[in-house]
């Protein structure tokens, strides 16, 4: 055994390594050296500054935070489990290598914020939005409490941190949802801040440590199999703190965005289409039934944005939206006629089962499918003037064989999202799909076609228990 490696492991473990520990951990010596040489006094100072700036309401003394930090950096001395040692080394390495650049930088002097004059007060749109939502408010409220509704008391503090994070890291992190609309219209209320970024895992691990060192409480990262590249941070009561989708840099580049107060938000035009698409998901309609007023102000703001940005006239005149579609129950495929618009495809096959789409793309021997990850929740392939794509939401039926207009419109919105992401033609169909929302009669739901069931195990990162499962 190499004496230098043995000495490093001995100093790190606080004891002489066993033969098994030596051979299992010798590949980690560089990381271990990085951990041991890490200046913990400077790190403790950064944590204190983060606490003072973002978590000032939480009662924890500097000595308590120092103790939490030093205890964690000696945690490897209290276990002989190789699996736990690997987890500790991996998490400590992430912490010492990335914390300063990811969260520590938030305490330094901020760059000048160029205030935005983009503000929308959608008075004229509120009545239109209210009438639209009244028409599609057709779901029966269930008693089930969704995880996103069970929020932690830490959300307010994390939101304060996230506002600064979004400004400092606006090349790699973008927001959408209620907070992004709040930036357009301050009368909108928001809960947690919805984000997409190119380094979600690193960010959430660092945030988990920051919360642990300040509060002394454990937080857990959870990766769910049915959402691509998604991780959620939960507190020790299993309440939601924040979640984040990870996207590739090329996907981030493709997302249409606007800059407000040094923060990039997903272009509200794209968010409007996403909202229309999500109304096909039955639990989102249940949210609408619980609180229509909350959705009204959001929709009104989005409608006002597209009215001003694209000059859309709201008169209810439309001839081709939702685009004509039919549903094959056995194959779970929707066929959409897109021929009346200036698209590069005349027809679209919309699959409700992602594996079936992947199989058919393979059979087509086509290798130019485009994957926009969670931005669209689907790949897109155009082959022989036919688009192939996947729809991840439930499908509502208005009769045994007829797709409910809410879902037909949601599928049409999904197709228009592709047009925007690929810089295709979308203004005329955008005007049509928005006007198709107006002057409608409420149609009850006849049945619900369930969405694709994803299989797989949850991934967990538990700092307290030294567990990392991918």
UniProtKB/Swiss-Prot annotation:
Example of a GO biological process term: mRNA processing
CDD domains: polyA_pol_Pox
EC class of the enzyme, as a word: transferase
InterPro entries the record matches: PolyA_pol_cat_Poxvir (IPR004976), PolyA_pol_cat_sf (IPR037265), PolyA_pol_nucTrfase_Poxvir (IPR024231), PolyA_pol_nucTrfase_sf_Poxvir (IPR038419), Poxvirus_polyA_pol_cat_C (IPR024397), Poxvirus_polyA_pol_cat_N (IPR024398), Poxvirus_polyA_pol_cat_N_sf (IPR038337)
Active site: 192, 194
Domain of life: Viruses
Gene Ontology MF, one: poly(A) RNA polymerase activity
This protein's UniProt keywords: ATP-binding, mRNA processing, Nucleotide-binding, Transcription, Transferase
Enzyme Commission code(s) on record: 2.7.7.19
Catalytic activity: RNA(n) + ATP = RNA(n)-3'-adenine ribonucleotide + diphosphate
Protein family per UniProt: Belongs to the poxviridae poly(A) polymerase catalytic subunit family.
Quaternary structure annotation from Swiss-Prot or TrEMBL: Heterodimer of a large (catalytic) subunit and a small (regulatory) subunit.
Role played: Polymerase that creates the 3'-poly(A) tail of mRNA's.
Protein name: Poly(A) polymerase catalytic subunit
Organism: Yaba monkey tumor virus (strain VR587) (YMTV)
Gene: PAPL
